Amino acid sequence: IATVDCSDYPKPVCTLEDMPLCGSDNITYHNKCYFCNAVAHSNGTLTFSHFGKC
């Protein structure tokens, strides 16, 4: 099972690196930074679904 380590987040600025991944909310995040910031702000309700677009 693939996981994403978000322990270093949230970060104030994300790069524009294009490595999409899909969250449990069925939203495609541009890269790990955007996803992990969303996880941090979701109070643990958002989880990783899979790499690539939803």
From Swiss-Prot:
Locations listed in the record: Secreted
PROSITE patterns, per the entry: KAZAL_1, KAZAL_2
Keyword Mitochondrion: no
Record SUPFAM superfamilies: Kazal-type serine protease inhibitors
Domain Kazal-like: 4-54
GO cellular component term, pick one: extracellular region
Protein's name according to its UniProt entry: Ovomucoid
Organism: Carpococcyx renauldi (Coral-billed ground-cuckoo)
